[in-house]
Amino acid sequence: LPVTSAADHASKLRGAKVLIEREERKTIILEQASRLCAAKGLELVEDIGLLEEVAGLVEWPVVLLGDMDRDFLTLPGEVIRLSMRTHQKYFAVRDPKTKSLAPHFIVVANIEAKDGGKAIAAGNARVLSARLSDAQFFWKVDTATPLYTEERKAKLAKIVFHQKLGSVWDKVERVRALAEELCAATGADQKLVREAANLCKMDLVTETVGEFPELQGQVGRQLSALTNGNRESVAAAIEDHYRPLGPNDRVPTDPVAVTLALADKLDTLVGFWAIDEKPTGSSDPYALRRAALGMVRLITSRGVRVNLFEDVEGGHWPGVVSRVARSITERRAAETIEPERALLPAIVRHAGQERVRAALASIIAPADITDAVLTNLRDLPAFLADRL
């Protein structure tokens, strides 16, 4: 395509059905998709990340509305959306009144077909049907048994969490012990916390999570409610114990979920510090900084009265850190943690204080004032809980 000057570059390409402006392609996709959905009394499920991705894949976006078998709506919405999004780059469509997914999808073609895109939409529907048929089979297998089974427990016991920290089931047992003791601080029902802890990693060995690993926790929540008849707080804790996943992620509100999330992050921090796998510079392969910040957000956002420094150093948490440390040191030399009681304060000061300093400075005080306050402050979480 000959271009004689920079001025006619865009117009020449447009004539050849190439839109060079990314924002224009995004606008066209949104407008056409919204119009097609509105014509059927539906609405587009917003997905900014997918919009960015699709806008970069097409030069001349042509939006089409496809159909899928209504039987697939028996699958969890997260499974349908992930299959559409990850594998096919489709947008989900829902009923604006119920917010439930509709048996349709939006696909963006890169060509204006002579038949108006009917063949393209039909072809994409067949591909999606194959994907969702697999997902439906996996879901049927997973829902045939309760979430907790001895078979799944045995599988977790064979999955290595870390060579020096044992299996995933070893971690579950440590988290359960920590969570039970944390109940006094969080006000959570110990029986429900124990039940949630036993279930929290079970979905890692389900067929559905094997196919869609991004749905860990979410699948467990669904299966817990369906097959175990668990209360909502237990089911929610299975999903929410991973949260917050980052600075912009929501913080759990239910006491059971808060307790389990704290225990899970505490076990991770204690464990990796014990085997000398601390973050260095920009390297943090086990996301320990995120875990530390997550603990701080859980404590401050929920007003949990946990005095991490004084309670541990003063021996007021009998066995909490020692139990984790002992479980770990059985696999390592005794000098791994010396002394055990000094471990947790070191972790919180090193991993958490820098996170707190940055967060505190950004919302309530200049950095120099924050540094002066934190220099002699021992009980960071309690201090923040009283002031944020």
Regions found by a protein language model. Name each.
Residues 1-388:
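Amphipathic alpha-helical "coupling" segments that flank catalytic cores
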